[in-house]
Amino acid sequence: METKPPIPLAVLVGIQTPDVDDIAHEASLAELGRLVKTLGYAVVGTVSQKREGTGAALLLGSGKLAELAALTGGTGVVTSMAPPPKSKARQRFEGAAEGAAPPEPDPDAARRPEFVIVDHELSPSQIRNLERATGAQVLDRTGVIVEIFHRHANTREARLQVEMARLKYVAPRLRESSGGGGRQQGPGAGESTLALDRRKIRDRLAELKTQLDAVQRDGDQRRSARRDQLRVALVGYTNAGKSSLMRALTGSQVLVEDKLFATLDTTVRILQPETRPRILVSDTVGFIKQLPHDLVASFRSTLAEALEASLLLFVVDASDPTYESQLEVTRGVLREIGADAVPSRLVLNKMDRLDPAARAALRDKHPDAIMLSAHAPGDVSALRDTLIAFFEAEMVEDTLVLPYAKQGLIGEIYESARVLSEDHDETGRVLKVRALPAAITRLKRSLAAR
């Protein structure tokens, strides 16, 4: 019978700086725990400390560092001379060499945490110091997010974007392997192993960029074809319920999981029941605080769905006590890509998780927000009506004359506009339509072309 490997264990580490209150600090650590769970690890402990900042070489004070090392089985010593923790094989070997009886097996030692996950971005030297002190592998928040993105990327574009971000994260954290600093390889005279590795990364990044540019050109062409269509983009913090709402609005079988970053690729579906003209709904990658800048830059083309949408729906988990800061993170990322000028509506999701008093307080605070549960058909139907009304206000009526020689364009007209009436005369079909001004302009251009 095949046995599954044990679930990796991890300890979380958080620093609470003076500008962060207790609620925000605890929420951030809880979010980090969910990120770690998404990686498939189990959180078995948390070490937290109030400090002025996160820039110190030791990160933690000596007492908290000792507490962390006790959990992981490390020495708690942070110096370049600190010996690495001895493996069980090394302990058995040294015990046999000295003729000593082997130590009694420690039932807890096998389950000591292999990972220390820090809720901040760390410098390479901080990572090395903590690894020496704890004997565990150290990941910072950025490293965890990059790894999750790497595992969840499905499309070619997403995989290319994530690999670029991952290499940019790894490059400054490379260091010489033990005994490797003196080796010289490669075409450059005196090129060390480290320099060679970094050069390989630079070459790979250049190769990835070329491939990504080609993929994105294809994506730009697809988006250009949808430019004058009715488009709604769901944007918001990760795990706010965007994919559940997407499924409810479109009837599509998009992935819905209680995991952070379950969706990395933009999905475009048609609002159901279908309208004329059709309304397209996009589900975009979720945001998170301290989202690595390289990941934001890498996903700029994916987020172009938000930039080019007619309407943004800011989907928020109303049951989360930190929803306001999550909303600000979303708005901040959209400002960064230039999408802050797109018309938007606030959608307070998961209202079914709140008691009547909390719901009333939210109504007072956000009187213009759309309040719903993605799992309540009545709420979803009301949102659909709101979307239709938004686009109706943007549409105009006009008359199109379709020559008999161009009857092949009738499908495009019915797809891009609502046909209110149809007559015939000696020139062709005379169609009274209602559509967005840009769509009517494009259709008239097509009809006038030879």
UniProtKB/Swiss-Prot annotation:
<feature type="domain" description="Hflx-type G">
    <location>
        <begin position="230"/>
        <end position="395"/>
    </location>
</feature>
<keyword id="KW-0547">Nucleotide-binding</keyword>
<dbReference type="GO" id="GO:0005737">
    <property type="term" value="C:cytoplasm"/>
</dbReference>
<protein>
    <recommendedName>
        <fullName>GTPase HflX</fullName>
    </recommendedName>
</protein>
<feature type="binding site">
    <location>
        <begin position="349"/>
        <end position="352"/>
    </location>
    <ligand>
        <name>GTP</name>
    </ligand>
</feature>
<feature type="region of interest" description="Disordered">
    <location>
        <begin position="79"/>
        <end position="110"/>
    </location>
</feature>
<feature type="binding site">
    <location>
        <begin position="236"/>
        <end position="243"/>
    </location>
    <ligand>
        <name>GTP</name>
    </ligand>
</feature>
<dbReference type="InterPro" id="IPR032305">
    <property type="entry name" value="GTP-bd_M"/>
</dbReference>
<feature type="compositionally biased region" description="Gly residues">
    <location>
        <begin position="178"/>
        <end position="189"/>
    </location>
</feature>
<dbReference type="InterPro" id="IPR016496">
    <property type="entry name" value="GTPase_HflX"/>
</dbReference>
<dbReference type="InterPro" id="IPR027417">
    <property type="entry name" value="P-loop_NTPase"/>
</dbReference>
<dbReference type="GO" id="GO:0043022">
    <property type="term" value="F:ribosome binding"/>
</dbReference>
<dbReference type="InterPro" id="IPR025121">
    <property type="entry name" value="GTPase_HflX_N"/>
</dbReference>
<dbReference type="GO" id="GO:0046872">
    <property type="term" value="F:metal ion binding"/>
</dbReference>
<dbReference type="Pfam" id="PF16360">
    <property type="entry name" value="GTP-bdg_M"/>
</dbReference>
<keyword id="KW-0460">Magnesium</keyword>
<comment type="function">
    <text>GTPase that associates with the 50S ribosomal subunit and may have a role during protein synthesis or ribosome biogenesis.</text>
</comment>
<keyword id="KW-0963">Cytoplasm</keyword>
<dbReference type="InterPro" id="IPR042108">
    <property type="entry name" value="GTPase_HflX_N_sf"/>
</dbReference>
<dbReference type="InterPro" id="IPR006073">
    <property type="entry name" value="GTP-bd"/>
</dbReference>
<comment type="similarity">
    <text>Belongs to the TRAFAC class OBG-HflX-like GTPase superfamily. HflX GTPase family.</text>
</comment>
<dbReference type="GO" id="GO:0005525">
    <property type="term" value="F:GTP binding"/>
</dbReference>
<feature type="binding site">
    <location>
        <position position="243"/>
    </location>
    <ligand>
        <name>Mg(2+)</name>
    </ligand>
</feature>
<keyword id="KW-0342">GTP-binding</keyword>
<comment type="subunit">
    <text>Monomer. Associates with the 50S ribosomal subunit.</text>
</comment>
<dbReference type="Pfam" id="PF13167">
    <property type="entry name" value="GTP-bdg_N"/>
</dbReference>
<dbReference type="Pfam" id="PF01926">
    <property type="entry name" value="MMR_HSR1"/>
</dbReference>
<feature type="binding site">
    <location>
        <position position="263"/>
    </location>
    <ligand>
        <name>Mg(2+)</name>
    </ligand>
</feature>
<feature type="binding site">
    <location>
        <begin position="373"/>
        <end position="375"/>
    </location>
    <ligand>
        <name>GTP</name>
    </ligand>
</feature>
<dbReference type="InterPro" id="IPR030394">
    <property type="entry name" value="G_HFLX_dom"/>
</dbReference>
<keyword id="KW-0479">Metal-binding</keyword>
<dbReference type="GO" id="GO:0003924">
    <property type="term" value="F:GTPase activity"/>
</dbReference>
<feature type="region of interest" description="Disordered">
    <location>
        <begin position="173"/>
        <end position="196"/>
    </location>
</feature>
<feature type="binding site">
    <location>
        <begin position="283"/>
        <end position="286"/>
    </location>
    <ligand>
        <name>GTP</name>
    </ligand>
</feature>
<feature type="binding site">
    <location>
        <begin position="261"/>
        <end position="265"/>
    </location>
    <ligand>
        <name>GTP</name>
    </ligand>
</feature>
